[in-house]
């Protein structure tokens, strides 16, 4: 963590383009970011729909880890990143000067994170997970938080929870790892989950939707310095991303999928578009990715109860802002 914060300090010393160096009213016309294999992020969709013009995204690679994504934003390797809200709270609490600006993924009845076992598995409940391996995309983020909450709600002690082994598996390999019995439980979400279900032979043990209902789970972040120096660019980015989220909500599913397939094919990263056809919904609870205080509070409270945060160590207002969201007034005036 010290290395990350040291890099944050160095990133803060870098010069950023000012208004005079960028065209028009935007402080910078280029935003560095990481993508995700075989999927389309909302900023990428916003760019393709023309909502982000004249600002352009500069892809520097892919990530499968939310914590790594926001660390890269904190150190200046990228201009923005995204992660589970609990992971964002932990990094900000450690001293990283980040601010969440818009929700970008979550769970609803169609789009959720499920924990799956093979048909016929002896694992039927939380107690059965003791001594077993659970495969997930990264540690310290959504998958781990939800699993531990499930175990706690079902009466496991801290010592018993420690006996459940977490194994990092790239999302595209998780289904295969389960079927080959390299893991006992697979954490699957979105299109990869639906493809695995289509292939048959797996059963849901539980899901985050079962525990919490519909909720926005993760946010996109910028550093506070970037926001201060590039407020018009950040405002345009949030507006464009919010509009892209709502475009997927109001556009026929087939049209959304076709657009995603087109974006993946055009960018030429040698990706499989097969899983995109399983897209169902944005999974974001509030209009335009508006962030509700409760979507951070639940995880801050959880971390305080677990002893990772001291009571009052993290102020919710320090974690996020809705000031750039075009739907802010509409939502708050309801």
Which ranges hold each PLM region?
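Short, low-complexity disordered leader/linker segments with a strong preference
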Residues: 1-30, 329-334
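Stable alpha-helical elements in mature extracytoplasmic
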Residues: 39-42, 65, 69, 84-87, ...
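A ligand-binding cleft/hinge motif common to bilobed small-molecule-binding domains
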Residues: 85-95, 147-148, 184-202, 302
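Pocket-lining segment of extracytoplasmic ligand-binding domains
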Residues: 167, 172-263
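Secondary-structure end/capping motifs
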Residues: 228-310
């Amino acid at each position: 963590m010290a290395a990350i914060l040291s890099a944050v300090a160095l990133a803060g010393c870098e010069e950023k383009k000012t208004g005079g160096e960028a065209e028009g009213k935007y402080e910078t016309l280029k935003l560095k970011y990481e993508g995700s294999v075989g999927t389309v992020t909302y900023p990428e969709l916003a760019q393709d729909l023309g909502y982000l013009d004249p600002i352009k995204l500069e892809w520097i690679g892919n990530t499968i880890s939310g914590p790594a994504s926001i660390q890269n934003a904190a150190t200046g390797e990228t201009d923005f990143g995204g992660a589970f809200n609990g992971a964002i709270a932990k990094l900000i609490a450690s001293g990283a000067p980040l601010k969440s600006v818009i929700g970008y993924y979550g769970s609803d009845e169609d789009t959720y994170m499920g924990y799956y076992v093979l048909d016929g598995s002896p694992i039927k409940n939380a107690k059965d997970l003791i001594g077993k391996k659970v495969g997930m995309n990264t540690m310290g983020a959504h998958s781990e938080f939800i699993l531990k909450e499930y175990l706690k709600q079902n009466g496991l002690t801290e010592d018993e929870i420690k006996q459940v082994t977490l194994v990092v598996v790239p999302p595209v390999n998780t289904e295969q790892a389960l079927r080959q019995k390299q893991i006992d439980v697979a954490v699957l979400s979105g299109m990869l989950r639906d493809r695995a279900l289509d292939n048959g032979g797996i059963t849901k043990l539980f899901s985050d939707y079962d525990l919490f209902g519909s909720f926005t789970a993760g946010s996109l972040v910028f550093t506070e310095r970037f926001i201060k120096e590039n407020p018009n660019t950040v405002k345009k980015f949030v507006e464009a991303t919010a509009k892209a989220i709502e475009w997927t909500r109001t556009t026929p599913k087939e049209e959304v999928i076709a657009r995603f397939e087109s974006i993946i094919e055009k960018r030429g990263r040698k990706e499989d578009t097969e899983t995109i056809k399983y897209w169902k919904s944005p999974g974001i609870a509030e209009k335009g990715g508006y962030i509700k205080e409760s979507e951070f509070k639940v995880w801050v409270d959880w971390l305080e109860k677990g002893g990772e945060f001291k009571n009052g160590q993290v102020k919710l207002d320090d974690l996020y802002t809705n000031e750039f969201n075009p739907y802010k007034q509409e939502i708050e005036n309801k």
